[in-house]
């Protein structure tokens, strides 16, 4: 089935309705589990989830937490995941809502409501390599070694569960609003508290006229993006992958593998051509970009500061602060247009630490940074938060962002698995 055959109205062919699977279970709280790439260094978190869920139907049984990647039981766990997916489908635990979208409201711990639309993207329009000017692009460099273990899970899996957050640059705040304003007219699919302090979530079915209006508004947004960024690119980025970069890259890799093994006519409408994501607005008040600072230990702070001033600084430019011992220095980075301070600093540190002693760590919070910087042979570099309107131009100008550029909320605020979609015929 092709998701593009929807009539004559002018609509997006990048973000599309899908045949969305919704669980028919007694406990949605036990069904919904946080993204597999969270709490990877805290196996006790996953032990608590396992104990809470038990044998009840849950997405915990349909995914492999990354804390278990590389373990001796990995292959057996993957086989069990794929078997459980089939069993859930055979037991009618998953109801299909054809050619639909789901509007989601997630109440975070700070009380703010994060809104999104669950739908499918066409992987033909997505690339995780910076040299390809696709409409959908990764925001961080893809670590290629992280893809094969994920492919083992997805390639033979009958269904997918999304934790990918796709961001649109809707500075006018128009795209999601057209659905929010008509929320009272939509069928509510679920509402419940998420486990492990994940907040509260509710979802509504988006179909009929509201769906058509949303897709038309989305197409208008895509056209505006072409005009907005015409000076940066003939084929500008329209959507950015905010969370779940490696999961989406895995979906693309599986689709490319399928293309190699089949003629185009046989797979052009294959469900694996698409991937389920949640679309959110970069400019929504609930989206908070928090800076991630750098601390370098086991190094000579004076020498590092001297090299940094020589290679990266001028009398004017982006202000940053460096801390070492009881000292604080204010520096001004010499940046080219659309370049981020974190890009300049990370490039410098990568080069400097190849030839000099020192280890880098990534720190949240200025107070923690300052405290750590008091230690001997340690220097902390405080970086400014990235402005929201810097994201799209930076990716289009410099390719993917440096690792640990910014943080979008706390771990417990990441997406939970709820909706699904068949990816096999």
Indicate residue ranges for each PLM-predicted region.
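Structural beta-strand/beta-sheet cores of well-ordered domains, especially the beta-sheet scaffolds
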Residues: 58-60, 162-164, 237, 272-278, ...
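Catalytic or ion-translocation cores adjacent to nucleophile or general acid/base/metal-coordination motifs
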Residues: 245-307
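Compact, glycine/acidic-enriched structural inserts
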Residues: 181-206, 284-311
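N-terminal extension/subdomain marker
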Residues: 3-198, 207, 224-228, 386-401, ...
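C-terminal catalytic or substrate-handling cores of phosphate/nucleotide-
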Residues: 293-405
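Short beta-strand segments
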Residues: 167, 242, 278, 382-384
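Active-site beta-strand/loop microenvironment that shapes enzyme catalytic pockets
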Residues: 216-262
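Conserved active-site loop/cleft motifs that coordinate metal ions or position small ligands
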Residues: 240, 379-384, 418-420
């Amino acid at each position: 089935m092709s998701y593009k055959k929807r009539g004559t109205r002018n609509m997006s062919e990048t973000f599309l309705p899908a045949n969305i699977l919704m669980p028919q279970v007694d406990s949605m709280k036990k069904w919904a589990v946080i993204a597999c790439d969270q709490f990877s260094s805290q196996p006790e978190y996953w032990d608590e989830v396992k104990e809470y869920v038990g044998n009840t139907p849950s997405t915990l049984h349909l995914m492999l937490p990354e804390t278990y990647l590389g373990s001796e039981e990995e292959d057996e766990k993957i086989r069990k995941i794929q078997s459980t997916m089939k069993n859930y489908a055979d037991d009618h635990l998953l109801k299909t809502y054809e050619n639909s979208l789901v509007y989601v409201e997630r109440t975070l711990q700070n009380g703010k409501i994060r809104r999104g639309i669950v739908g499918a993207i066409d992987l033909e329009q997505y690339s995780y390599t910076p040299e390809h000017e696709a409409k959908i692009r990764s925001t961080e460099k893809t670590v290629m070694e992280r893809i094969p273990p994920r492919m083992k899970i997805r390639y033979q899996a009958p269904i997918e569960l999304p934790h990918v957050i796709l961001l649109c640059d809707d500075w006018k705040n128009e795209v999601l609003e057209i659905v929010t304003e008509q929320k009272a007219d939509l069928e509510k699919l679920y509402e419940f508290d998420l486990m492990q302090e994940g907040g509260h979530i509710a979802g509504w079915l988006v179909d009929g006229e509201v769906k058509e209006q949303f897709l038309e508004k989305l197409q208008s947004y895509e056209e505006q993006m072409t005009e907005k960024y015409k000076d940066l690119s003939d084929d500008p980025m329209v959507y950015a992958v905010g969370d779940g970069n490696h999961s989406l890259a895995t979906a693309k890799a599986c689709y490319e593998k399928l293309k190699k093994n089949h003629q185009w006519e046989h797979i052009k409408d294959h469900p694996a051509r698409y991937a389920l994501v949640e679309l959110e607005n970069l400019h929504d008040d609930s989206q908070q970009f928090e800076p991630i600072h750098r601390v370098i230990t086991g190094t000579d702070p004076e020498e590092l500061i001297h090299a940094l001033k020589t290679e990266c600084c001028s009398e004017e430019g982006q202000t940053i602060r460096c801390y070492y011992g009881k000292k604080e220095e204010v520096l001004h980075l010499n940046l080219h247009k659309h370049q981020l301070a974190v890009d300049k600093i990370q490039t410098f540190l990568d080069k400097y630490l190849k030839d000099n002693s020192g280890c880098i760590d990534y720190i949240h919070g200025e107070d923690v940074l300052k405290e750590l910087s008091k230690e001997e042979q340690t220097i902390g570099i405080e970086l400014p938060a990235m402005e929201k309107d810097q994201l799209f131009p930076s990716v289009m100008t410099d390719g993917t962002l440096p690792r640990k550029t910014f943080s979008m909320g706390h771990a417990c605020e990441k997406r939970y698995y709820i909706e699904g979609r068949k990816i096999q015929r």
